[in-house]
């Protein structure tokens, strides 16, 4: 009997149920991580970008070209394809199970059955539970990509540097930002274990810790500890090196902008967060799941979906580099979007601050934003804020 290509039929079903969106808002500009693509298909794109070594901002315009069959500008699709997209993986080095996890109520039934029947020695796939980790990895990877190659980088250049960066996220225990490292830190410090769904708060704490473990002078991480408050004195301490130089700093705002859905009063500020030149996207924000949001069009947000299981890299040695085919699995031109009213309110919002001038620019934009602010900038931490730890992680685990 001939084998049946189940994957082919699954792709057909997914296409029928989730067709690629068309540009049905031709009069609305399109945004992708701070870059604006105008509504006309032949026009200009604008970007607020670092125009000098001191970080002074100036506006630059670049002509756009033709649109594709769904009427999206090709330059916009090139931008989307150049973002790093990290998804579920399978057949990686097992992540050991904790000895007392046999009946863990935080684990979904599907994940529990899979762990008993297929991954009895440990988790060799994160399908069904790792989507928030993957979204967080995507956010961190794109922040690092911007620092390494610049916001204007597009696929087809600097392939060696891109592959080296991606290898830091490979699915083996030695990779500094692997899912193994996330799970290890989550178990030790965040009360999150293999097979459990991580929330935005735990993901932010893992990112901060894993970056700190590298001891790099190229990136630091500021997290808001489950509030929307950012303190200038605390940020300055984190972002300043011993010799006084500014170290690029990733700001992670873990927040909840409503109860079941994002409160409409926050819509404008949430969309503007993805329009800022410092934006590196949003992780979370989808009921019972997590996605990596990178763009805005009208009331819709574009996202990269981590819920696609791919084989882990065969290159497990820390000194290996990924092949061209493996690098391709970290990119897609396939657009997906969701109306802002359908977003889950629990999310992790990221901004990369590259210089003191960048900080001043970002702060000015935040303070002058529309609608209810999703970030509050205060001069110093004078109060002992004790946010409820569980609030930011109360998103139902994905069961698939």
From Swiss-Prot:
Its EC number is 3.4.22.-. GO terms for biological process: aggrephagy; autophagosome assembly; mitophagy; piecemeal microautophagy of the nucleus; protein processing; protein targeting to membrane; protein transport. It is an enzyme of class 3 (hydrolase). It is found in: Cytoplasm; Nucleus; Preautophagosomal structure. InterPro entries: Papain-like_cys_pep_sf, Peptidase_C54, Peptidase_C54_cat. Keywords: Autophagy, Cytoplasm, Hydrolase, Nucleus, Protease, Protein transport, Thiol protease, Transport. It catalyses: [protein]-C-terminal L-amino acid-glycyl-phosphatidylethanolamide + H2O = [protein]-C-terminal L-amino acid-glycine + a 1,2-diacyl-sn-glycero-3-phosphoethanolamine. One of its GO terms (cellular component) is cytosol. GO terms for molecular function: cysteine-type endopeptidase activity; protein-phosphatidylethanolamide deconjugating activity. The active site is at 131 (nucleophile), 305, 307. Cysteine protease that plays a key role in cytoplasm to vacuole transport (Cvt) and autophagy by mediating both proteolytic activation and delipidation of ATG8. Required for selective autophagic degradation of the nucleus (nucleophagy) as well as for mitophagy which contributes to regulate mitochondrial quantity and quality by eliminating the mitochondria to a basal level to fulfill cellular energy requirements and preventing excess ROS production. The protease activity is required for proteolytic activation of ATG8: cleaves the C-terminal amino acid of ATG8 to reveal a C-terminal glycine. PANTHER family: CYSTEINE PROTEASE (PTHR22624:SF49), CYSTEINE PROTEASE ATG4 (PTHR22624). Belongs to the peptidase C54 family. This is Probable cysteine protease atg4. The gene is atg4.
């Amino acid at each position: 009997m001939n084998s049946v290509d189940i994957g082919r039929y699954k792709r057909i079903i997914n296409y029928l149920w989730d067709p690629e969106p068309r540009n049905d808002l031709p009069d609305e500009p399109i945004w992708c991580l701070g870059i604006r693509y105008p509504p006309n298909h032949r026009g200009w794109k604008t970007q607020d970008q670092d125009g000098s070594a001191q970080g002074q901002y100036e506006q630059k315009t670049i002509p756009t070209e033709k649109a594709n069959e769904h009427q999206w500008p090709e330059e916009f699709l090139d931008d989307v394809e150049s973002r790093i997209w990290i998804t579920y993986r399978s057949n990686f080095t097992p992540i050991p199970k904790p000895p007392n996890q046999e009946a863990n109520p935080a684990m979904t039934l599907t994940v529990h059955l899979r762990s008993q029947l297929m991954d009895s020695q440990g988790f060799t796939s994160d399908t069904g539970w790792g989507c928030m980790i993957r979204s967080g990895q995507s956010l961190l990877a794109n922040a690092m990509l911007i620092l390494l190659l610049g916001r204007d980088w597009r696929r087809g250049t600097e392939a060696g540097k891109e592959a080296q960066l991606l290898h830091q996220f490979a699915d083996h225990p030695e990779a500094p930002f692997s899912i193994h490292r996330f799970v290890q830190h989550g178990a030790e410090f965040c009360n999150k274990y293999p097979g459990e769904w991580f929330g935005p708060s735990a993901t932010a704490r893992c990112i901060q810790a894993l970056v700190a473990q590298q001891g790099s002078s190229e990136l630091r991480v500021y997290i808001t500890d489950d509030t929307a408050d950012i303190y200038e004195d605390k940020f300055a301490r984190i972002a300043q090196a011993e010799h006084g130089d500014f170290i690029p700093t990733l700001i992670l705002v873990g927040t909840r902008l409503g109860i079941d859905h994002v409160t409409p009063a926050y819509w404008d500020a949430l969309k503007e967060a993805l329009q800022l030149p410092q934006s590196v996207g949003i992780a979370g924000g989808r009921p019972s799941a997590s996605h990596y949001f990178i763009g805005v069009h009208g009331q819709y947000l574009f996202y990269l979906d981590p819920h696609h299981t791919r084989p882990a890299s065969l290159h497990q040695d820390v000194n290996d580099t990924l092949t061209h085919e493996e690098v391709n699995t970290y990119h897609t031109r396939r657009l997906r979007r969701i109306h802002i009213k359908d977003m889950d309110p629990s999310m992790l919002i990221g901004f990369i601050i590259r210089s003191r001038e960048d900080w001043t620019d970002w702060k000015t934009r935040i303070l002058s934003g529309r609608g209810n602010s999703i970030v509050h900038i205060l001069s110093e931490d004078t109060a002992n804020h004790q946010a409820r730890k569980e609030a930011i992680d109360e998103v139902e685990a994905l069961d698939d």
